[in-house]
From Swiss-Prot:
Protein kinase that plays a central role in centrosome duplication. Paternal copy is required to regulate synthesis of daughter centrioles prior to fertilization. Maternal copy regulates centrosome duplication during later cell cycles. Functions upstream of sas-5 and sas-6, and is required for their localization to the centrosome. GO terms for cellular component: centriole; cytoplasm; nucleus. The gene is zyg-1. This is Probable serine/threonine-protein kinase zyg-1. Gene3D superfamilies: 3.30.1120.120, 3.30.1120.130, Transferase(Phosphotransferase) domain 1. Its EC number is 2.7.11.1. It comes from the Eukaryota. The lineage of its organism: Eukaryota, Metazoa, Ecdysozoa, Nematoda, Chromadorea. It comes from Caenorhabditis briggsae.
Amino acid sequence: MSGGKSGTKLSSFQNLQQIGQGGFGVVYSAQRENGEKVAIKKIGNAASQTRIKEEIKTMKLLRHRNIVQFYETFFENGETYLVMELCEGGSLMDYVKQKGPLDDSTAVHILRQLIAAVKYIHDENILHRDLSAGNVFIKDATKSTITVKLGDFGLATNLGQHGTACTIVGTPGFIAPQVFGQNYDQAADVYSLGAVLYTMLTKHTPPTKGPPNLESLKKRNPSAADLVERMMHTDARRRIQLKEIVMTDYVKAKMGEATPGSREHSRDSRSQRSREPFRSSRDGISLERRPPARSSSQPVNSRRDPDGYRAAHEMPTTSRTSVEPDRARVRHRLSARGIGSSQEDDLRQQIWPIRMERLVGQRVRTPGGRYIVEMNTRCRFEVVSKGNIVLRILVVEYDPHLLIQTVYVHKMSNRVEHARNETDDLIELTRSPISYTSLSQLPKEVMNDYMRLEKMMVSTIASRVAKITHRRPSQFPDASAQLMENGDLRIRFPNSLIVRRKSNGEVHNYIDGFANNKEEVRGLQLSKVREVYACLTQLEQCLSRMNPTMKILPMVFSAGPDIVATYNNSPSSILPSTSSQASRFPFSEISSSQQLVPHSAPIPNKPLSSRTTSSLNVRNGVSSDENTAPAATRQKYKARLDPVTGRIVSVQAEDNRKLRCSTSKPDQFIFTDPSISSSEQRFMRNGRVPERASEMLHALLVYMKKKQN
């Protein structure tokens, strides 16, 4: 096929080669003038215009990493052309025919991607209706990680809520039996998905009549045969549901494996869950991404570092040597709006969208500008030029409902704004920003700003926020160990700070908390650091497998000798029976006859003793009751009475930290810590509590409770 007459839209594409043909059109690979490779589907004028419009409408609507991305459409000589993402690996059917049956790990890896795509279109009330191995495409068959894309939505149909379809369509062998009865719903796609799994495991297409013969598959892997049988059950009412597939023995047994053909796209499972990429778009539509999940998908919260170790905190945790060259190449390639290499593809997954969960409230001021996390879905970068003038403001927002990240650029061309300090008010935004919805749309200047913002979020801001805090671990009884949001481990002593970098595994002790006064940790101390790190990371993994509706993170807990002994054997067994997050949730005024209700923490496998939970935890140092605190804790703080009302209104620590009740709002508190800043920190009882104010808040409330009684 030629590129068309000069001056036409088709003539702007080069190197057109036919790569596929179906009943509704011919597909070509092509190349844009900027070098980007795309797929072009040519639909003849004999095709139904209604069907063409439906396919275009459906493809424009769908944005998901495992669905072929639609770029644009144009019409020439009575024919319709659809420009889409090119999957150079060909169809899954051709791949299996060439390579033979896939191993179980690879099959499960592909199945999980297809489940995600099918679930997404079902959530949009869309049936694919032609889900077959021939319509599943491999992005790049030369890569060790197989990424598949669901394509060809020419037969897709939109269902109303709880609706059904009534047209016989699909690929023989992959069609559910109820389709022939012309009354079917989303369960039909599950049947087709089972047929795809059967093809991957056997290399054969399912029979057009009757169920497939699974005898040979049962001998090889009974659990795989059982899943295929349940997915291809002739009775739609008894067919396994889409959401249940990932919980079957066959899938669960292979989810943790990382073979060359089945390892996950990201470097660790958390990145895989939380960083689904957007792809390039030619009409402002970007690829879908799953909602962000951090460990156990908990609500956002953040804690600023409670001490003055600012110099050590702000040391980058991402190696510039390994990352910067890649990022430079990405900036160069993406500025030309081209699809990058596999390395750039992987990097694109890491940097779009930006992770903001549980980082809300963080601020950083550098000579280049001010970085602020306004909400768990919104951050900004106020870009500063020479002369301390704000050039523009980059605002990044993530919509958890539409699953889209948008970058807004506010240019300060009509007014002069001077750079502000870290804690100053936000600069007012312009009314007409320029918006971008995919990484490839960003011009070079905006790309540079975006990369700076993303790096600051990962290397500095995430290293300030603690995910899990273990006070007084058995290995270091006079310290507090923290697993940070970026994966670093920080063990805080009265006069030093031990840091284990996740990026390179290096462990250093920062004397007095300064970056220029450090020493490498060795010997027995290094072994203890590794023990603490292993315990906290295992605890994090345990929490990540819990019900995502439970509000767990961030977690702060203390453990006495009895519990620590158990903790060293099994991290999951030491979780407090009531929430250890003293600073995270509200505690009402509870009378002596009422029982304190546990909040959002798991119940231990075995009761620690017959004593009540609160008394046992106080004895062991696990503070779980907001209305009680050990006497030693209360004695550390001096209470002050209001001379008029006689009520306790504040407490003060020996190091001059002060916590007082607000006079303007009944549930608001004001905290000052001179060792960090002279400014006041205001927080609500049921909001984010500064960590160094947590214990003081306990004591203040106990004092107030006793005074009332």
